[in-house]
Amino acid sequence: MTIQSIVENELVDDGHSVWLLNDHREFGYSDGAESEQYLDKVFRSAKDLSSRSSELEGHIKDWPSEYHLTSKRSQLLSGFTFDRSSRVLAVGCGCGAITRFLGETFDSVVSIEGSINRARLARLRTRDLDSVSIVCAPFQKIRFSQKFDIIFCIGVYEYSGWFVDGQDPYDAVLRYFADLLAPDGIVVLAIENQFGLKYFSNSREDHLGTMFEGIEGYHRHPGRVRTFGKVELESNLRKYFPCVEFYYPYPDYKLPDCVVSGQFLASQRAGELVSQSKSRDYSGPRQVFWDESTAALE
């Protein structure tokens, strides 16, 4: 199926094989012009764009480039078995690291990104994959003619308060996903843990760069961006999805060393494995007050 047959809105090609809504308006999320220009240069010159590309990893020079170029991004999903024929929607594709893996794994992927610069980078990363269509638009404005078997929302849900209007944007996003899901379909959602161990010790909140912001309830920056603990997240999800299953990437979903099931996490074997994963403060250097790996064993 073509993207025009899947999306009911009028679409226009921006000249870079990215599809735009006819009334496209720019979304201002960015890692910065310098970072995006660097990725553009790397992707254009790369011969191996795959999700496991050591060539791309050789161009890592800082945290933004590591996030977009490391093969660890795909490790979040590579341990799961998927049906290749599943109809897939990816919401918030960024610069294409996860979308690249999805395009290698599925025959049909529609990936949405609000920023035109990041959407073009995602298209460059997936330029050899005919299975992938990149649409630059606010996802909630797109009307689809089909349901999806799997919806991936990786590192996006926490920004709902930023780009979705309404009294409860986090609820609105989940309701949108539920309406788009085929019978027996699934939503794969990855988000940081509001009460992650590193936040009680020596790390600033990943999005806002403020110590203890999440564990104190985001009262300094209400309505901008927020993560959730397991209890609240599960409560949100069960309003629309009766079956909720948790998996735990360590140290986090961004750069996972391993992904374990809830059942394994409850076993006596889990502590030794997850204690080997070292968390990071992505805002910069941190002072270590106590050993997280030892605490994980407890």
What are these regions (language model features)?
Residues 222-246:
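Short alpha-helix
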Residues 1-48:
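N-terminal auxiliary segments of SAM/dcSAM-dependent transferases
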Residues 105-132, 138-140:
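Class I SAM-dependent methyltransferase SAM/SAH-binding core
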Residues 168-186:
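A short glycine-rich, Lys/Arg-flanked "PGG" loop and its adjoining helix->strand segment in the class I
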Residues 143-151:
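A short acidic, Gly/Pro-enriched loop at the edge of an enzyme's catalytic core
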Residues 232, 249-298:
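Rossmann-like AdoMet/SAM-dependent catalytic core
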Residues 188-211:
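Conserved class I S-adenosyl-L-methionine
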Residues 95-106:
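Conserved SAM-binding loop of SAM-dependent methyltransferases across substrates and taxa
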